[in-house]
């Protein structure tokens, strides 16, 4: 598939206008607990080099990445520990302070944009090392919509692991944790093992990325969707769920009304 967001990476202007080759490094995720994800798959790296002949991708060696080092080397990519020659370094989650290379350009989710106090020291280290940070969270298109976000898969994985936990609690079935599934196909195969009692009831809230991601998982299961009134007031002889929008589980304290714009700007009224 096409990767239009890669144009953003390549369009970044570096300090040297005479640079004939742009070196992009794929860093090893360093957070604890370990994160298996990677910003670009082997196929995407290959596509990137093909689309932009002046781009060379180097992958930092990793024993835990969802794609093995061999999968990158097999298609001709360089896999090594040292990425100090790279102009642009791509990761997924926060980079440990000790692993930050001074005077480089990084792309990753830093979780500092909202002034998160737990990453204040990370942001200070970035400033001290004169690093240019491009945070995926703030990359937007011409319509001011985010280009990159993991909300959907947060919903997918969260819902999957909720059913994993339900199986552990009841002993009715057993499925492997989401992070041990190799792909979406295996996730769906595992879900076929789920067995639910006829009195099982579930409520989904919200139609954002996370809510819709969770809905994807629920719709794969033998659970009938019903409207909220039916859910509350009728008897059911099968597993059911209902999906609530914001106005269905929040109301104004004074008159039980709802105004969406007011709710988001003055949530304390609800």
Regions found by a protein language model. Name each.
Residues 1-18:
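Short, Lys/Arg-enriched N-terminal segments with co-localized hydrophobic residues
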Residues 34-52, 56-59, 177-270:
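Glycine-rich phosphate/diphosphate-binding loop of Rossmann-like nucleotide-binding domains
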Residues 79, 106, 133, 239-243:
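Conserved beta-strand scaffold positions in the cores of enzyme catalytic domains, especially
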Residues 23, 97-200:
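Glycine/serine-rich phosphate-binding loop and adjoining beta1-alpha1 elements at the start
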Residues 46-49, 79-81, 110-113, 128-131, ...:
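Short, surface-exposed linear patches
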Residues 25, 76, 155, 206-211:
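Glycine-centered flexibility sites
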Residues 20-125:
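An N-terminal-biased, well-structured beta-alpha scaffold segment characteristic
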């Amino acid at each position: 598939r096409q990767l239009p967001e890669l144009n953003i990476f390549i369009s970044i202007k570096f300090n040297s206008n005479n640079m004939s080759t742009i070196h992009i490094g794929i860093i090893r995720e360093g957070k604890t607990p370990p994160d298996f994800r990677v910003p670009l798959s082997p196929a995407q790296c290959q596509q990137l080099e093909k689309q932009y002949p002046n781009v060379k991708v180097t992958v930092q060696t990793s024993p835990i990445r969802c794609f093995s080092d061999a999968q990158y080397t097999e298609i001709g990519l360089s896999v090594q520990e040292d990425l100090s020659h790279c102009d642009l370094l791509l990761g997924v989650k926060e980079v440990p302070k000790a692993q930050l290379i001074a005077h480089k350009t990084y792309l990753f989710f830093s979780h500092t944009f909202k002034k998160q106090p737990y990453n204040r020291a990370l942001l200070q280290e970035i400033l001290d090392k004169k690093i240019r940070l491009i945070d995926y969270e703030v990359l937007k298109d011409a319509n001011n919509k985010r280009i990159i976000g993991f909300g959907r898969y947060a919903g997918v994985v969260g819902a999957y692991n909720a059913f994993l936990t339900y199986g552990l609690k009841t002993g009715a079935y057993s499925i492997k944790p989401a992070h041990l599934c190799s792909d979406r196909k295996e996730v769906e195969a595992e879900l076929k093992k789920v067995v639910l009692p006829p009195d099982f009831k579930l409520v989904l809230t919200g139609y954002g990325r996370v809510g819709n991601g969770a809905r994807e998982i629920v719709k794969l299961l033998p659970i009938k969707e019903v409207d909220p009134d039916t859910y509350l007031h009728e008897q059911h002889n099968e597993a059911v769920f209902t999906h609530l929008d914001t106005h269905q589980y929040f109301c104004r304290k004074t008159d039980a009304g709802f105004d969406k714009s007011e709710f988001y700007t003055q949530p304390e009224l609800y």
